[in-house]
Amino acid sequence: MNNFILLEEQLIKKSQQKRRTSPSNFKVRFFVLTKASLAYFEDRHGKKRTLKGSIELSRIKCVEIVKSDISIPCHYKYPFQTLVYLQVVHDNYLLYVFAPDCESRQRWVLTLKEETRNNNSLVSKYHPNFWMDGRWRCCSQLEKPAVGCAPYDPSKNASKKPLPPTPEDNRRSFQEPEETLVIALYDYQTNDPQELALRCDEEYYLLDSSEIHWWRVQDKNGHEGYAPSSYLVEKSPNNLETYEWYNKSISRDKAEKLLLDTGKEGAFMVRDSRTPGTYTVSVFTKAIISENPCIKHYHIKETNDSPKRYYVAEKYVFDSIPLLIQYHQYNGGGLVTRLRYPVCSWRQKAPVTAGLRYGKWVIQPSELTFVQEIGSGQFGLVHLGYWLNKDKVAIKTIQEGAMSEEDFIEEAEVMMKLSHPKLVQLYGVCLEQAPICLVFEFMEHGCLSDYLRSQRGLFAAETLLGMCLDVCEGMAYLEKACVIHRDLAARNCLVGENQVIKVSDFGMTRFVLDDQYTSSTGTKFPVKWASPEVFSFSRYSSKSDVWSFGVLMWEVFSEGKIPYENRSNSEVVEDISTGFRLYKPRLASCHVYQIMNHCWKEKPEDRPPFSQLLSQLAEIAEAGL
């Protein structure tokens, strides 16, 4: 009777991190619930299932939904938790499990509650949010064993099935959903039967947006399919992304360069200001009496009444920003010149997609063409190549014995879901022949450290600050997704067109098998970028990434110099332990160097998060260093 299967399903589990040094990762597992235990198996296609863990139901102290306030970094978005008592070590540990949909999660939680509600060791309070970065997100307590902050009711919804809907409720549930229209910002060509081709500026019905990176849409002829969400934007008169003059997250320095390169009187753009939700109009003019043309910046102000209205010059107030821009395209109205030529950088080139096609992460060898070797890294050689002879890609061939391949393959699909304009996109893996290959977005100018050294003496301080901003944007995204880089440095960032910098190789050091690189005593271990808690205890967190980011900023503002110059690893450890920090680079302002020093606080909790660093750097950039 105890072996009777109550539920079985493929779910995703988060590593339990029973040791402080254990990595935080997500793995697909096949879960089986019986009257006696909750077991999970490794389930690979064509292979026998392997038991990876089993929990006696009698030891479960709590089963509950996790009310998350963060982006879930795996493709199952419905988390629940079990708190388990381990009699052997007299300790508690959490098992976070992610279901594919709300119904699946509800089914597992209700069944587990029913089977455990009479356990002797149930808790009276639990934590409704995640334990993350050394604290509970729900109540900010800093001890993992801390008593919960919300009452736990083991019987709530456990044994009672919901009442059937009334006829009125039933009719309501079958009402047609309100139609949402989206607009394509780019063309998207595809031959995949699961997908739908897009034409720039055409409208589509949004059918399903539950997947972050791929939306299901329908065209005006009734054809349906998936398309990359980064190519689409919701249709709304106040959605600025539909307008050719809007540049979402461009820095002041890059905006000025674009407008100066245009060189046309009245060339303009609207961009995000440093305060979230506010905007700036930047316009090029030759009208001011001076030898050189210049860029003027106007903050778009808001009225205090409701609904808000917008203006640049107080005499001319409008109900929306598009109406304000439309007026000033025909009238100066207090501006140095009227807005004549819209300038937009981000619509010139379509963004990368999360995967080369919808649902595709395994790439066939016949689909890849190798062109030339362009570098080498910790895992092996890197080649420029093409996918299906048309999409330029970077292909990393993995040297035998360099990587824990099985562990990486388990997480590759999850890593592909990480997609951001300032991250180098992993497109997929090629597994069917040795050596295995990783297929990445191709970045034109190679790694940042080499680029800085090759162009030394040619950079303005504003340009270097823009590079740091790019990296910080990517790291703020990883921080929000609860992903630790573990090896952030200029060598692991890549340079693309228009000097856009993207973070690469995030989390990859978890799969390195070379002890000389992964052990803090190894000759290849990157001590010069490591925080004190990393080289002393191998304790990684987003705050250890912040320390590394401070060193990366130093690399950038010293135009590619090696930190701590000729000091050995042991000397660096000794210096840092006695309070020594890197000197201020010549091109770094006092404000910039102050941020570096904030990153190098000895205690991790004293270092700012990337979200705060991003705001501080943006403020410095807007103020002109």
UniProtKB/Swiss-Prot annotation:
Every copy of the SH2 domain together lies at 245-343
In the record, biological process GO terms are: adaptive immune response; gamma-delta T cell activation; intracellular signal transduction; NK T cell differentiation; positive regulation of cytokine production; protein phosphorylation; T cell receptor signaling pathway
GO molecular function term, any single one: non-membrane spanning protein tyrosine kinase activity
Outline the inducing conditions.
Through a myriad of surface receptors including the TCR/CD3 signaling complex, coreceptors, or chemokine receptors.
Q: Which UniProt keywords apply?
A: Adaptive immunity, ATP-binding, Cytoplasm, Immunity, Kinase, Metal-binding, Nucleotide-binding, Nucleus, Phosphoprotein, SH2 domain, SH3 domain, Transferase, Tyrosine-protein kinase, Ubl conjugation, Zinc, Zinc-finger
Name the enzyme group at the top EC level: transferase
Task: Report the main location listed first in the record.
Answer: cytoplasm
Q: Which residues form a coiled coil?
A: none
Q: Where does the protein end up?
A: Cytoplasm; Nucleus
The annotated region (Disordered) lies at 153-174
Q: Which tissues is this protein detected in according to the database?
A: Is detected in the thymus, lymph node and very faintly in the spleen, but is not detected in the liver, lung, kidney, heart, brain, intestine or testis. Expressed in T-lymphocytes and mast cells. It may also be expressed in natural killer cells.
* Reactions this protein catalyses: L-tyrosyl-[protein] + ATP = O-phospho-L-tyrosyl-[protein] + ADP + H(+)
A Pfam family of this chain: BTK
Domain Protein kinase: from-to ranges: 368-620
Instruction: Give start and end of each SH3 domain.
Output: 177-237
Provide the assembly information.
Answer: Homooligomerizes; this association negatively regulates kinase activity. Interacts with PPIA/CYPA; this interaction regulates TCR signal strength via a proline-directed conformational switch in ITK. Interacts with THEMIS. Interacts with FASLG. Interacts with VAV1; this interaction is important for VAV1 localization and TCR-induced actin polarization. Interacts with TBX21.
Name of this protein? Tyrosine-protein kinase ITK/TSK
Q: Which organism is it from?
A: Mus musculus
